[in-house]
């Protein structure tokens, strides 16, 4: 790959999804996310809910920045997403955002598949968050 950052899934699954499907790679790691907030489920749910709202805006902003070839804003938005994804345990999205941010160091090498992989992962996280937030508190 041109950027030297892998956009494929890791060689081994990260674990179960929040829906408990053991065959599906983990989209976001609730255990890791809960660790970041000392196991406070209520606080974690608030953070995840806020992340979900922000990601819609960030995704739309990123599309505009890409369209206008505003590479600094692409890098800044990717950096923001990377940090937020890390906070909730969305490791694959964090990696995709990091790859997109790094690609902005030489945007002429940016490949469409890099952008597509980022938006696919963002959509997967948003879908998984929806399922997570539909669960009654205590079932995460």
Predicted regions and their residues:
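Two-component system phosphorelay core
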Residues: 1-140
